[in-house]
């Protein structure tokens, strides 16, 4: 028997994959220049081509609230189960949350 790996990116084969048309593309400058303010709601959308400031895959698709800034990255408060977690994420992995309603 062989032990299965328990690395940081395990079980992320389909999650951290781009479509063939997007492959190799770096994030657009307009996406990097977005300034978030404290209290803004954002969605964590991992960009697999940018490794810096990448959150763990368990936060993919989660909606959080900006609570501060640390260097180029943002502090995002995310609800995970019944707990509030604070993660440090760079803007390449964030998308503004637009609630319809």
Swiss-Prot record:
<feature type="region of interest" description="Disordered">
    <location>
        <begin position="1"/>
        <end position="24"/>
    </location>
</feature>
<dbReference type="InterPro" id="IPR001147">
    <property type="entry name" value="Ribosomal_eL21"/>
</dbReference>
<dbReference type="InterPro" id="IPR036948">
    <property type="entry name" value="Ribosomal_eL21_sf"/>
</dbReference>
<dbReference type="InterPro" id="IPR022856">
    <property type="entry name" value="Ribosomal_eL21_arc"/>
</dbReference>
<comment type="similarity">
    <text>Belongs to the eukaryotic ribosomal protein eL21 family.</text>
</comment>
<dbReference type="GO" id="GO:0022625">
    <property type="term" value="C:cytosolic large ribosomal subunit"/>
</dbReference>
<feature type="compositionally biased region" description="Basic residues">
    <location>
        <begin position="1"/>
        <end position="18"/>
    </location>
</feature>
<dbReference type="GO" id="GO:0003735">
    <property type="term" value="F:structural constituent of ribosome"/>
</dbReference>
<dbReference type="InterPro" id="IPR008991">
    <property type="entry name" value="Translation_prot_SH3-like_sf"/>
</dbReference>
<dbReference type="Pfam" id="PF01157">
    <property type="entry name" value="Ribosomal_L21e"/>
</dbReference>
<dbReference type="InterPro" id="IPR018259">
    <property type="entry name" value="Ribosomal_eL21_CS"/>
</dbReference>
<keyword id="KW-0689">Ribosomal protein</keyword>
<keyword id="KW-0687">Ribonucleoprotein</keyword>
<dbReference type="GO" id="GO:0006412">
    <property type="term" value="P:translation"/>
</dbReference>
<protein>
    <recommendedName>
        <fullName>Large ribosomal subunit protein eL21</fullName>
    </recommendedName>
</protein>
């Amino acid at each position: 028997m062989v032990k299965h790996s328990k690395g940081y990116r395990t079980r992320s084969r389909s999650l951290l994959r781009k479509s063939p048309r997007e492959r190799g593309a770096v994030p657009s400058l307009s996406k990097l220049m977005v300034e978030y303010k404290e209290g803004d709601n954002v969605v964590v959308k991992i960009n697999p081509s940018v490794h810096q400031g990448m959150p763990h895959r368990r936060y993919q698709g989660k909606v959080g609230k900006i609570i501060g800034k640390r260097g180029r990255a943002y502090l995002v408060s995310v609800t995970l189960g019944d707990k509030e977690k604070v993660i440090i994420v760079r803007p390449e992995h964030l998308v503004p949350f637009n609630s319809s309603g």
